[in-house]
């Protein structure tokens, strides 16, 4: 995290053209070494992209920077991973495309730009939730089976999670880190299933899965551009809503034998499976499916 700073110069990395023979190319992304003392006690302003964060920060530190501010445009905010081997603080600044260009231009054209910075704190913005990660899998399934993929989505971007035993901070405490990817989304989904199983120990795996899918949040979900509404090939049935899943009034069951019989390689038809999704690759205009629900709310289905 950044310490508090007072009247420190913010210097744009793009002022360095020493690493290129083309005068129109610069080192704004900080992926090449800067000249000695290029920053000399300044905070470096570096654009995201091309190389990883550690390279940017270490290049700036070697040139005398006391901190790094990485800016990016048109992407959801991210955590700056891989900084364990760096020696100066670094932060991430998310801006719109227009604001990012204007900000860099201002710092470049109005040097020296002095900044004050309070100590790093926590900022929560609910608008950054339910946005599809740009690295996440999209449907339909790779084998074109007539079963919707992905089926369900869970939080998997910028998750505050405990790290493995043995990773400790300077105070001897086990750290928490921000992680992302399948390593986050998958345990959220598995954990949701385990909790539903604890509530309803008599339910089958298929019933538990259907409870999670049938109650998922499927509105106000966005693609990675943070603007375009997401669709079923982005989120499947939606984002896990564990509270509603535990209160579902309907579930769907399916047998092992039926899953085996639905194998297309053996002449089966996956779209006939009693699952909580509907997909028909040959559907033109109008098509139909048959599904069977079981009431678990104490009233007839």
PLM regions: where:
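Secreted peptidase-domain scaffold signal
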Residues: 2, 25-27, 126-127, 131-136, ...
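Hydrolase catalytic cores
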Residues: 53-83, 153-228
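Extracytoplasmic/secreted envelope proteins and their assembly/folding machinery
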Residues: 54-57, 100-104, 132, 186-193, ...
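Marks the mature luminal ectodomains of secretory-pathway proteins
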Residues: 88, 126-129, 135, 142-146, ...
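Structured lumen-facing ectodomains of secretory-pathway proteins
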Residues: 1-154, 162-164, 232, 240-246
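Short coil/turn segments at secondary-structure boundaries
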Residues: 118-119, 224-227, 272
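Active-site-adjacent structural elements in folded domains
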Residues: 30-31, 172-180, 273-277
């Amino acid at each position: 995290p950044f310490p508090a700073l007072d009247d420190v110069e913010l210097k744009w990395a793009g002022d360095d053209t020493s690493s290129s023979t083309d005068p129109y190319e610069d080192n704004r992304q900080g992926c090449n070494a800067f000249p000695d003392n290029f920053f000399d006690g300044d905070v470096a302003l570096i654009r995201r992209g091309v190389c990883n964060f550690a390279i940017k920060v270490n290049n700036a530190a070697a040139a005398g920077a006391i901190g790094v501010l990485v800016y990016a445009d048109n992407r959801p905010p991210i955590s700056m991973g891989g900084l364990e081997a760096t020696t100066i603080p670094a932060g991430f600044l998310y801006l719109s495309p227009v604001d990012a260009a204007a900000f860099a231009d201002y710092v470049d054209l109005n040097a020296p730009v002095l900044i004050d910075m309070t100590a790093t704190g926590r900022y929560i913005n609910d608008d950054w939730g339910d946005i599809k990660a740009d690295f996440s899998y999209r449907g339909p399934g790779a084998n074109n089976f007539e079963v919707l993929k992905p089926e369900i989505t869970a939080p998997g971007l910028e998750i505050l999670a405990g790290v493995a035993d043995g990773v400790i901070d300077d105070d001897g405490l086990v750290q928490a880190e921000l992680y992302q990817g399948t390593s986050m989304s998958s345990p959220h989904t598995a954990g949701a299933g385990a909790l539903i199983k604890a509530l309803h120990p008599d339910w089958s795996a298929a019933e538990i899965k259907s409870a999670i899918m049938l109650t998922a949040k499927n509105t106000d979900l966005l693609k990675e551009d943070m603007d375009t509404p997401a669709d079923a090939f982005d989120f499947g049935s939606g984002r896990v809503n564990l509270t509603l899943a535990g209160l579902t009034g309907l579930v769907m069951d399916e047998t092992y034998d039926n899953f085996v019989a639905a194998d297309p390689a053996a002449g089966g038809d996956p779209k006939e499976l009693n699952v909580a999704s509907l997909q028909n690759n040959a559907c033109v205009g109008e098509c139909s499916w048959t599904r069977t629900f079981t009431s678990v709310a104490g009233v007839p289905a």
